[in-house]
Regions:
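Alpha-helical transmembrane-bundle signature of multi-pass membrane transport and export proteins
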Residues: 2-219
């Protein structure tokens, strides 16, 4: 029947589009990260709003952005070397746990109404340092999450779609949250979202990596 053939064709096309999701480890990763990325974008927008509300300074917003980005630029070579040498799963657990702690400290400072601009900038530097290691770890771990090497490109495409979707959804939601509960609870929610990521990573069953030959850090 033509209708049956059309449905089979659509089903086959969907399987190709989402073929990386056949891998259990990748499903866990994408599920945990989808929630966390949305709330992370909520924190970014809420933090910018808090800084501007408190300081009424565009320059302060510039300092905040600079503080969050400069560590990744300076530490990229070192981070890549560490990712090659150390267990990627445990590196990701460490970076996510540290990011969770950063969010909780930020939430406490704002909710207790004791936060200052320079404390917030310092915490942005801390998060930038964490992200400098976190981003290459994610990229390297992706190869271990798919069942077939040919699914890697699809996994990267789905990950990019998820990231861009989070950029759209997070800022859309955070405006309502700021009005209703304030910036501090947005930061608290971000910290709690990392629990989903840590649970997903803990549930993964990854094959042991072959032992790497000892190498110097920069060559």
């Amino acid at each position: 029947m033509p209708a049956d053939e059309s449905r089979l064709h659509r089903a086959a096309r969907l399987r190709r589009i989402f073929r990386a999701l056949h891998a259990r480890n990748y499903r866990l990763y994408l599920g945990g990260q989808s929630l966390s990325f949305i709330v992370t974008w909520m924190q970014r927008v809420a933090l910018n709003w808090w800084v501007y509300r408190v300081t009424h300074s565009v320059l302060a917003l510039g300092w905040l952005g600079f503080a969050g980005q400069i560590p990744a630029l300076l530490l990229a070579p070192l981070a890549g070397a560490l990712v090659d040498r150390w267990d990627r799963r445990w590196l990701l657990i460490v970076t996510q746990a540290l990011a969770m702690l950063q969010a909780f400290v930020l939430a406490w400072l704002v909710l207790a109404d004791v936060a200052t601009l320079w404390q917030v900038v310092a915490l942005s530097v801390v998060l930038g340092l964490i992200n400098a290691l976190d981003m290459p770890t994610r990229q390297a771990l992706m190869m271990d999450l798919v069942d077939q090497p040919e699914d890697l490109s699809n996994a990267l495409a789905l990950n990019s779609t998820m990231t861009n979707g989070a950029r759209l959804v997070g800022p859309t939601i955070v405006g309502l949250m700021i009005i209703s509960v304030g910036e501090g609870r947005c930061f608290l929610l971000n910290g709690l979202s990392y629990l989903a990521v840590l649970a997903a990573i803990a549930a993964m069953r990854l094959p042991p990596r072959a032992a790497a030959a000892p190498r110097h850090l920069f060559w």
